[in-house]
């Protein structure tokens, strides 16, 4: 540690360098951009010509083939860009490129629910560098995005508050830089697992923070430390609303990372992206899925994921629950505080949306050892069976369990109860549920009753009391 401090001090003592670019301004390698404990290596960003940032416009009229636009107003006027629509600008991260399928797939989901100008930013000329260099190139790309936003306002009358920047990884900090350069006038910035190395713990002027837009929300999916866990995302809160799905570190469906001993951040990405970065990539997959599942990513205000998992943060508060992803800006209390933390669980496959329920079961019948399961039936569909309790089943006992259904069942109409013995029981005992209450995350409770008991592996249907 002493050597690192000495190294940083010596770097900071060296006279800083500066580069200037037309319309974008000047960029220095002085602190806090370089020569600090968090950013020990001094570097200047590459030129706009070398980075070659491109803006790829998709609209409802051209969903499959982009139109290339620039910050020149004439190119925008000659495109399908509509000033009466919201503009969402998607910015990729390290090693990535603007023509990856995930960006256009996100646009296509938007077209299913809204009329929108969807611009994918391609800055692969600057992202496919060493990581330390790419973190400096972020500044130039952010300046170019800010220039585009300013031209939309000055030349086309399209206000910044109708612009939404969505950045993944380093792209989150590109969005933050653009927000700073437009003095927080941009309507919304969404950070999708904002990159940790060279940003965590740095001053706000270096990274994404809540002052960069009128509303900033963030999704954290790879928040374990970079060393030794190889977590690429920030654990630090950066927005008005910060969501930590599945606790924010290990996402369902992602294998444990066997490359966790690699510590050279300039070499960890190439060739390992799809495997090593599974948690990191989940953030944009969740966002894409949230667009077509407007109620499937409810976040619960909680002090920690452990407390959330202990069923102590249900149901939603008086203002409801914010939705992680596309509809986070619909939450009434979105900007009442900074760094509000929310937790939720997701699925492990392509359909990531989940709906949380609390089930309370009061048992009847005989005393046995076994486990009980419940399935929900509503006007929106039927859930699969979920285990509520396993152990000694006593008549009159009440068991409570929260679970995350892959189906929004809507208004509950009935429930089905089933139980199984843990051991062979020749007496063929009968067990039932005299009452089952189901609470949704909005606080509405549905009550169901039955006087019947059943043998194991026999369904018991309970109707509304």
Swiss-Prot record:
Residues 1-16 form the signal peptide. It catalyses: a triacylglycerol + H2O = a diacylglycerol + a fatty acid + H(+); 1,2,3-tri-(9Z-octadecenoyl)-glycerol + H2O = di-(9Z)-octadecenoylglycerol + (9Z)-octadecenoate + H(+); 1,2,3-tributanoylglycerol + H2O = dibutanoylglycerol + butanoate + H(+); all-trans-retinyl hexadecanoate + H2O = all-trans-retinol + hexadecanoate + H(+). Its main location: secreted. Its EC number is 3.1.1.3. SMART domains: LH2. Keywords: Calcium, Disulfide bond, Hydrolase, Lipid degradation, Lipid metabolism, Metal-binding, Secreted, Signal. Expressed by the pancreas. Pancreatic secretory (zymogen) granule. It is an enzyme of class 3 (hydrolase). GO terms for molecular function: all-trans-retinyl-palmitate hydrolase, all-trans-retinol forming activity; lipase activity; lipoprotein lipase activity; metal ion binding; phospholipase A1 activity; retinyl-palmitate esterase activity; triacylglycerol lipase activity. The keyword Transferase does not apply. Residues 355-465 form the PLAT domain. Disulfide bonds join 20-26, 107-118, 254-278, 302-313, 316-321, 449-465. Gene3D superfamilies: alpha/beta hydrolase, PLAT/LH2 domain. Ca(2+) binds at residues 204, 207, 209, 212. Pfam families: Lipase, PLAT. InterPro entries: AB_hydrolase_fold, Lipase, Lipase_LIPH, Lipase_N, Lipase_panc, PLAT/LH2_dom, PLAT/LH2_dom_sf, TAG_lipase. It is found in: Secreted. One of its GO terms (cellular component) is extracellular space. Plays an important role in fat metabolism. It preferentially splits the esters of long-chain fatty acids at positions 1 and 3, producing mainly 2-monoacylglycerol and free fatty acids, and shows considerably higher activity against insoluble emulsified substrates than against soluble ones. Belongs to the AB hydrolase superfamily. Lipase family. Forms a 1:1 stoichiometric complex with (pro)colipase/CLPS. This is Pancreatic triacylglycerol lipase. It comes from Rattus norvegicus. The gene is Pnlip.
């Amino acid at each position: 540690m002493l050597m690192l401090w000495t190294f940083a001090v010596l770097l900071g003592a060296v006279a800083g360098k500066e580069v200037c670019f037309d319309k974008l301004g000047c960029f220095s390698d002085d602190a806090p951009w370089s020569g600090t404990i968090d950013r020990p290596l001094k570097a200047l960003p590459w030129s706009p010509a070398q980075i070659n940032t491109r803006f790829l416009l998709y609209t409802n009229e051209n969903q499959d083939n982009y139109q290339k636009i620039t910050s020149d107003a004439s190119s925008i006027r000659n495109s399908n860009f509509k000033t009466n629509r919201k503009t969402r600008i998607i910015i990729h991260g390290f090693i990535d490129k603007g023509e990856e399928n995930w960006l256009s797939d996100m646009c296509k989901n938007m077209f299913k629910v809204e009329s929108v100008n969807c611009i994918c930013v391609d800055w692969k000329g600057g992202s496919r560098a060493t990581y330390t260099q790419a973190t400096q190139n972020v500044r130039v790309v952010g300046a170019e995005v800010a220039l585009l936003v300013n031209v939309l306002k000055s030349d086309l009358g399209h206000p910044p508050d109708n612009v939404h920047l969505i950045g993944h990884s380093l792209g989150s900090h590109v969005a933050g830089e653009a927000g700073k350069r437009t003095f927080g006038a941009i309507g919304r910035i969404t950070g999708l697992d904002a990159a940790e190395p060279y940003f965590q713990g740095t001053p706000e002027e270096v990274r994404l923070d809540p002052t960069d837009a009128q509303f900033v929300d963030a999704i954290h999916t790879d928040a374990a430390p970079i060393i030794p866990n190889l977590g690429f995302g920030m654990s630090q809160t950066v927005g008005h609303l910060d969501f930590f799905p599945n606790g924010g570190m290990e996402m369902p469906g992602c294998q444990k990372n066997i490359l966790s001993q690699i510590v050279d951040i300039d070499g960890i990405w190439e060739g390992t992206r799809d495997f090593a970065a599974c948690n990191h990539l989940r953030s944009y997959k969740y966002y894409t899925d949230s667009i077509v599942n407007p109620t499937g990513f409810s976040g619960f205000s909680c002090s920690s994921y452990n407390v959330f998992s202990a069923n102590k943060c249900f149901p939603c508060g008086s203002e409801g629950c914010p939705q992680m992803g596309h509809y986070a800006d619909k939450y009434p209390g979105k900007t009442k505080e900074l760094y509000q933390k929310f937790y939720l669980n997701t699925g492990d496959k392509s359909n990531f949306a989940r709906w949380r329920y609390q089930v309370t079961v009061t048992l009847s019948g005989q005393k046995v050892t076994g486990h009980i399961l419940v399935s929900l039936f509503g006007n929106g569909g039927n859930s699969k069976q979920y285990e509520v309790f396993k152990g000694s089943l006593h008549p009159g006992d009440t068991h409570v369990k929260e679970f995350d259904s892959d189906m929004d069942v809507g208004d509950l109409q009935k429930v089905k109860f089933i139980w199984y013995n843990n051991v062979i029981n020749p007496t063929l005992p009968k067990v039932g549920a005299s009452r089952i209450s189901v609470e949704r995350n909005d606080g509405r409770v549905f009550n169901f009753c039955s006087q019947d008991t059943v043998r194991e592996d026999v369904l018991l249907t309970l109707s509304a009391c």
